[in-house]
Swiss-Prot record:
Tree of life domain: Bacteria
EC number: 3.5.1.88
Protein name listed in UniProt: Peptide deformylase
Pfam families recorded: Pep_deformylase
Gene, per the UniProt record: def
Source organism (scientific name): Porphyromonas gingivalis (strain ATCC 33277 / DSM 20709 / CIP 103683 / JCM 12257 / NCTC 11834 / 2561)
Keywords noted in UniProt: Hydrolase, Iron, Metal-binding, Protein biosynthesis
Length: 189
């Protein structure tokens, strides 16, 4: 089932998400719906807060980026209760976009490597060290479960320059190819 994407300005995007337990209701169905919604929206990642749930669930498929970023080849994950344990010292700046911030793309500086621990959809524990764009994608989605957005990492001047676009998103004056929920009333369209 396709789920609507919650847009910038909705309070759920600013909540720190909670860990879940293996008995979370209909978890497999939720993961399948999140994955379907991510693909339908042409995304490479989706976090549960982006569909209105303040829980620590991420779905990622960065494989479409493999031609430009070989480290993304086959990089498909479900990450539950993820926690970044360590961030590398080397930084890299790349453009990022977000389904919750349609039509906004900004340069974001992030560590080029991370160490993350999480459980998968079967609640099997994992710990991985990720590098390059795969690390960037995970950090971007991880921000969502910590109540952050990629625009929180840009300069005040850049934020000022996109202020009008952000206001339009809040007002629902934005076109998308996917269903959305806008702020502050949670109106669906």
């Amino acid at each position: 089932m396709l789920l609507p994407i919650y847009l910038y300005g909705h309070p759920v995007l600013r909540k720190v998400a909670e860990d879940i337990t293996p008995d979370y209701p209909k978890l497999k169905e939720l993961i399948a719906n999140m994955t379907e919604s991510m693909y339908h929206s042409d995304g490479i990642g989706l976090a549960a807060p982006q569909i209105g749930l303040p829980i620590r669930v991420l779905v990622i498929d960065a494989d479409p980026l493999k031609e430009d970023y070989p480290e993304c080849a086959g990089f498909k994950r479900v990450m539950i209760n993820a926690h970044i344990e360590e961030r590398g010292e080397d930084l890299c700046t790349e453009y990022e976009g977000c389904l919750s911030l349609p039509a906004i793309h900004e340069k974001v500086e992030r560590p080029t490597s991370i160490r993350i621990r999480y459980v998968d959809e079967d609640f099997q524990p994992h710990e991985e060290v990720l590098h390059g764009f795969a690390a960037r994608v995970v950090q971007h989605e991880y921000d969502h479960i910590d109540g952050k957005l990629f625009i929180d990492h840009i300069s005040p001047i850049r934020k000022q320059l996109i202020k009008g676009k952000l206001q339009n998103i809040i007002k629902g004056k934005v076109r998308t190819s996917y269903r959305v929920v806008t702020a502050p009333t949670g109106k669906r369209r």
